[in-house]
């Protein structure tokens, strides 16, 4: 189950933003991702964009998820406020109008403004490290001091009687950064450090004796209830529909004078706000540190949006249905020069979702797996995020067995969509960076901020 998603979601790691001095005039109003200096006053105002700019989606996180108390300190060398008329404009939620002034917090200052506080006590506080990967240990598990991630990996391997193989020479590095790369070597290191298989089996027996109390597998669905994940999908779907008056024109023509790329970019920009609302409804996401919430959304936004519009397009033939209500036909995509990636979306995602009749609960669980990405760069506690991802895995597997008992391979088939989402997500980022560089496609404020500061901590 884990193999399909390891290392996913760290999408900007391979795709750096183009130099912020690119000719695109829209980028002048966005904090650059280069080292911050004195505030930059653009010599010419940016040209008007089709929809009015709404500001950064991330003040919504800091306002509606609770302020961390004190504002993060300014990054080194930064003096003065960010003078950006676009980002500092009033945030208005879709379908909800503008909130009161106190609900709007200053935007996140690029990625260099993200402040991840060090763990209490610092590195020299006498904390034990995980014997397998070197991360912070959460205690002794199965006879060895280990982190929650390696504990969960070992437990799942034993309980499901999983077997692994190594693609290299069975001597892969297993550390905090690369522990998900090779499951075979990670498991061998668990055994080499002294983790006991029988301890897992005894724990399972104790869990059965207590009718699923404790940390037995039976508790996982309650910890990550799929009905709440479905509620999150349905809630943001309704919010998206409020801005749609009816099906738009096919191929981006008729009522929409824009080309397909512009339509897709504008739809993605609007959906970034909805994405924040969705994430807040996923169990346990709001309990993560505020900075980690921002990092996870930055790391997964493109895959999360692609998964949504792919599933929304199941009933559309040879095209996709945007959240704005517009249909984009593959012929239009080909004429706009994005036919190859468009066809990959149709064949690797939309048609596969259609063939297996993926339901919205399963879609929500896949998106939650993408969201809880322990490999996102800069997380203050990746182990905690990994535990949440494990809980989604367990809940999704239980749901598949109960809802589709006759389809034994359904859970695995769902997870096989995750590598395709990651690959397509990276390719879409490349296209967006190119459109931004040449500057002939209107890219709105939220989307531009994502491209200016692509989830990389300095």
Curated annotation (Swiss-Prot):
Q: Which gene encodes it?
A: Rxrb
Q: Which SUPFAM superfamilies match?
A: Glucocorticoid receptor-like (DNA-binding domain), Nuclear receptor ligand-binding domain
Q: Which CDD domains is this protein grouped with? A: NR_DBD_RXR, NR_LBD_RXR_like
Compositionally biased intervals (Pro residues): 32-56, 69-78
User: What family is this protein classified in?
Assistant: Belongs to the nuclear hormone receptor family. NR2 subfamily.
Q: Where is this region: Disordered?
A: 1-105, 201-223, 238-261
The reply on keyword Chloroplast is: no
The region called Hinge is annotated at 196-220
Q: Entry's Gene3D superfamilies?
A: Erythroid Transcription Factor GATA-1, subunit A (3.30.50.10), Retinoid X Receptor (1.10.565.10)
What subunit structure does UniProt give?
Homodimer (in vitro). Heterodimer with other retinoic acid receptor family members. Binds DNA preferentially as a RAR/RXR heterodimer. Interacts with NR1H3. Interacts with AKAP13.
NR C4-type zinc finger locations on the chain: 130-150, 166-190
Residue spans of biased composition, Gly residues class? 245-255
Q: Which organism is it from?
A: Rattus norvegicus
Q: Name one Pfam family in it.
A: zf-C4
The segments labelled Modulating in the record are 1-129
Q: In which tissues is it expressed?
A: Expressed in the adrenal gland with main expression in the zona fasciculata (at protein level).
Instruction: Output compositional bias ranges, type Low complexity.
Output: 18-31, 57-68
Where in the cell does this protein reside?
A: Nucleus; Cytoplasm
Q: Name one GO cellular component term.
A: cytoplasm
The molecular function terms in GO held by this entry are: chromatin DNA binding; DNA-binding transcription activator activity, RNA polymerase II-specific; nuclear receptor activity; nuclear retinoic acid receptor binding; nuclear steroid receptor activity; nuclear thyroid hormone receptor binding; nuclear vitamin D receptor binding; protein-containing complex binding
Q: What is this protein called in UniProt?
A: Retinoic acid receptor RXR-beta
Q: What does this protein do?
A: Receptor for retinoic acid. Retinoic acid receptors bind as heterodimers to their target response elements in response to their ligands, all-trans or 9-cis retinoic acid, and regulate gene expression in various biological processes. The RAR/RXR heterodimers bind to the retinoic acid response elements (RARE).
Know anything about its domains from the record? Composed of three domains: a modulating N-terminal domain, a DNA-binding domain and a C-terminal ligand-binding domain.
Q: What range(s) does the NR LBD domain occupy?
A: 221-454
